Amino acid sequence: TKVVAPNRVVEHGQTFRFGQVTLRMHHYGTAHTPSDLCVEVLPDRVTYVGDVAMNNRIANMDDGSYVGTFKYYEALQQAAGDQLWVPGHGRPSRTLLRDYGEFMAGIYEPALKAVEDGQGVEVARANVLKDPRVARHARTMQGFDSNIGKYVSLAYLEAEKIAF
C-alpha cells in the first residue's frame, strides 16, 4: 500500500462519479474540526460522517464546536435526508446523528445554562453528569470517564465565548 497525500481541494456539494456510483461532498463548517467533510454515496443512501458523529465513543472537540455540530447535523440531514450514517468510530446507524446530537446537547445545554446563571464549570459538570442524555452513556461509552471533564470544560468555554 502506498500512501498518497491529497492533491486537490474538495468543495461542498461537489460530486464525483465512479461508474454507477456518485459521491457527493458535504461541508457545513466546524463540527468536530474546521475541516469536517462527509461523503454521501448517492445511489445507496449511505453517508460516511467520519468523526462528525461517533457511536458509543466521545469525540475530541479540541478544535470543534458544539453549536457548529448542531448546525452541521441539521444541514446534513436536510440535504441528505434519511440515510445510513457511517461514523469514523462505532457502528453505522440510521439514528446516529439524532442519538449523538442528543448526547452532545446533554453536555452543551447544562454548560450554557451554568454560564447564563453565572455558575462555575464545576456546577456545569455536575449538571451534565445528571443529564439523562449523558448519564445513560456513562458506563458504556469508550473514553467517557477520562474525557467528560474536558468536554464539559470545552462546552463551558464555548458558551462563555458566545455569551460575550
What are these regions (language model features)?
Residues 1-4:
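Acidic/polar short surface loop at catalytic or gating sites that assists cofactor/ion binding
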Residues 6-7, 82:
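Short, well-ordered alpha-helix to beta-strand connector turns
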Residues 7, 55-56, 60, 127, ...:
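Detector for Asparagine
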Residues 8-12:
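Short acidic-hydrophobic, aromatic-tinged amphipathic segments that line or gate anion-handling sites
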Residues 15, 22, 27-113:
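Metallo-beta-lactamase
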Residues 78-80, 93-164:
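Accessory terminal helices/loops
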